[in-house]
């Protein structure tokens, strides 16, 4: 069955046909689909890429490991989609990549995806000592992105990620709230101010 579904993706001869074929393959939820779903991320078909990302997220850790082993260093579009999948999976093994991409990647779409992912890590998969150290790194990177990234969409993502990081990183909640408060009053973009203010308000209310 999976062989036929994979063949259908490879044989698709239209954008709509590719989306349908990828959707069918994703719905099968089989690890055999992972290489093909990853390859779709490099196609110039955003609709198919969205479906492939969703399929990879459903497959979890095996998909994350495959993405990490096959990351496209040259196609920034494929890299951004791959990081969106990693963000959705929350795989702790992806943390080094997410941290470096959030800080250093030239592509704003990659930085935004990586920043978003730093707030969605499966912290329960790490030991307490590793968890505390990695959460500190995430906070410092997100703070850097929130304050200094030149693209407002990345700063917006950083504010959202700090909000989702805070409940798991109780030792950092005061620092996170202070960082959000500062940005709510200083960012040049009103959308970032508003998102920072919303995150701070939700944290204060325990939402």
Swiss-Prot record:
Pfam families: HEAT_2. It comes from Synechococcus elongatus (strain ATCC 33912 / PCC 7942 / FACHB-805) (Anacystis nidulans R2). GO terms for cellular component: phycobilisome. One of its GO terms (molecular function) is lyase activity. Keywords: Antenna complex, Lyase, Phycobilisome. This is Phycobilisome maturation protein. Belongs to the CpcE/RpcE/PecE family. It comes from the Bacteria. CpcE and CpcF associate to form a lyase.
